[in-house]
UniProtKB/Swiss-Prot annotation:
Known catalytic reactions: guanosine(37) in tRNA + S-adenosyl-L-methionine = N(1)-methylguanosine(37) in tRNA + S-adenosyl-L-homocysteine + H(+)
Major localisation: mitochondrion
Quaternary structure annotation from Swiss-Prot or TrEMBL: Monomer.
Keyword line: Cytoplasm, Methyltransferase, Mitochondrion, Nucleus, S-adenosyl-L-methionine, Transferase, Transit peptide, tRNA processing
The organism of origin for this protein: Fusarium vanettenii (strain ATCC MYA-4622 / CBS 123669 / FGSC 9596 / NRRL 45880 / 77-13-4)
Record-listed E.C. numbers: 2.1.1.228
Single Gene Ontology BP annotation: tRNA N1-guanine methylation
Subcellular location: Mitochondrion matrix; Nucleus; Cytoplasm
A GO CC term assigned to this protein in UniProt: mitochondrial matrix
Annotated protein name in UniProt: tRNA (guanine(37)-N(1))-methyltransferase
Role noted for this protein: Specifically methylates the N1 position of guanosine-37 in various cytoplasmic and mitochondrial tRNAs. Methylation is not dependent on the nature of the nucleoside 5' of the target nucleoside. This is the first step in the biosynthesis of wybutosine (yW), a modified base adjacent to the anticodon of tRNAs and required for accurate decoding.
Matches recorded under PROSITE patterns: SAM_MT_TRM5_TYW2 (PS51684)
Molecular functions per Gene Ontology: tRNA (guanine(37)-N1)-methyltransferase activity
Length: 465
């Protein structure tokens, strides 16, 4: 079917206008289209005539619509007979509106062109169809569509011009997304109410139930979304960062939240010292550790991030000297096996940290000065005395959205201000360089980045303040 024919049919199926409605009346969206159908004499001919009539552009085309339906004659429909709904230009009583293909098939008795009343209900229309029919035309350009889905909660950020329609927008979202039970609207910026990146919200639809369960990277997280930070749009970034970690290494997650980096890393045998200052995040992190059975590898902390950075290296070194290890129980042998059960595998905690993760983009760079003197007096743990390298720091941050290298320079200067070493954009593995990864848009003029660099020796081994 050519594009003009498709547009012609689709225009007939536009949702009825319900301009400026403030409450949802689903009955408004019911309509009946007086159409025609090809009543097929035998169902085995359905595929043949669908293909032929599509070539002649006589089959009704509409997104989400299957033109093969039960025959309009109840007695034939009860026998399982089907029909093909035809385009509106086909008139049952006017053979001159039929193509030669349709006329010939009718003469052969393989089909009959009959009237067909096509009933369309509210369920047929998608979210955009319904909302467009309600909003004034001048608001069609930026219909609220992008939202975070956290478990059963849809989190909107509705702009001012759409606020008069917020409740009806929420109701349509609930209707068209069965997995969503609650719709909320953010009424302040994340973190503006407190330091834990939570936000004030209003419930637009459904119950005020923020206890959610989400699955990410094969892990289950349960939490109260109103009390902790979670962003489902960061799942790709979580996977990217954890892909750098190797089993048996130690990672210090400074602003761990409820564990989107820590718990998946623990699943792959990485030791994670996971910290968050928010007591609620710490509580749900502990739950995630138990739920996902990663307690051998993930250790939760509830400290201020500044203090955690300064003490983390010493804590890991002490754990290594104590002989701390993860004990991995091997799979049980078959019941009838005569072989003795295998011994548990012990994975020792290494003496040094391989990676630091700092996912607090609004202010994480301001924590970097705490790395000065991190390994003061322990130079012998690293190259050239051993094969161990200093840790890589992954620090998330915001910067301007620009096409040139201005954001990169800005990030390098801010890092320099904190650690006293000027890095240049490049490779995280190379001395004096920093890999600046563009994570995602967060606002029209703002983007989120992740700066990854190996901690410079002059910082790590500096005298402690």
């Amino acid at each position: 079917m050519d594009k003009n024919s498709q547009l012609r049919d689709m225009n007939l199926f536009r949702a009825p206008a319900a301009r400026a409605a403030k409450t949802l009346d689903r009955s408004v969206f019911a309509k009946t289209l007086n159409a025609a159908a090809a009543s097929i004499s035998e169902n085995r001919l359905l595929s043949k005539y669908r293909k032929e009539l599509e070539k002649t552009q006589e089959v009704l085309f509409m997104e989400r619509f299957n033109p093969i339906l039960p025959d309009p004659d109840p007695s034939l429909a009860s026998q399982g007979r089907k029909c093909i709904v035809l385009s509106p230009q086909i008139k049952p009583a006017s053979p001159e509106t039929w193509s030669p293909t349709l006329q010939e098939a009718s003469k052969l008795g393989e089909l009959k062109v009959v009237p067909y009343d096509l009933e369309i209900t509210y369920d047929f229309w998608n979210y955009f169809d319904v909302v467009k029919s309600i909003l004034p035309e001048e608001l069609h350009g930026e219909i609220p569509s992008g939202f975070n889905t956290v478990g059963h909660v849809a989190h909107l950020n509705i702009r001012d011009q759409y606020l008069p329609y917020k409740n009806i927008i929420a109701q349509v979202l609930l209707d068209k997304n069965p997995h969503i039970k609650t719709v909320i609207n953010k009424i302040d910026n994340v973190g503006s109410e407190n330091e834990f990146r939570t936000f004030a919200y209003e419930v637009l639809g459904g119950p005020d139930n923020m206890n959610v369960e989400v699955s990410e990277a094969g892990c289950i997280f349960r939490f109260d979304y109103s009390k902790v930070y979670w962003n489902s749009k960061l799942d790709t970034e979580h996977k990217r960062i954890t892909s750098f970690f190797k089993p048996g290494e130690v990672v210090a997650d400074v602003m761990a939240g409820i564990g989107p980096f820590a718990v998946p890393a623990g699943k792959k045998g990485v030791f994670v010292w996971a910290n968050d200052k928010n007591p609620e995040s710490h509580r749900y992190l502990e739950d995630a550790i138990q739920k996902n059975k990663v307690w051998e590898f993930v250790k939760p902390f509830n400290h201020d991030g500044h203090d955690f950075i300064r003490t983390s290296a010493d804590l890991v070194l002490e754990a290594s000297k104590r002989g701390d290890c993860a004990v991995i129980k091997p799979p049980r042998p078959p019941r009838k096996s005569a072989a003795p059960p295998p011994e548990p595998v012990r994975v020792p905690v290494p003496p040094t940290i391989s990676h630091f993760v700092m996912n607090l983009p609004a202010s994480a760079i301001e924590f970097l000065h705490n790395y000065r003197g991190l390994y003061h007096g322990h130079e012998d743990l690293f190259e050239p005395h051993t094969e161990t390298k200093l840790p890589i720091v992954h620090v998330h941050c915001f910067s301007a959205k620009m096409d040139d290298d201005t954001p990169l320079k800005d990030i390098c200067e801010r890092i320099h201000k904190e650690i006293g070493v000027m890095l240049k954009p490049g490779d995280a593995e190379k001395e004096g360089e920093v890999l600046i990864y563009d994570v995602r848009d967060v606002a029209p003029a703002k983007r989120m980045f992740c700066a990854s660099f190996r901690l410079p020796r002059e910082v790590a081994f500096a005298a402690r303040a």
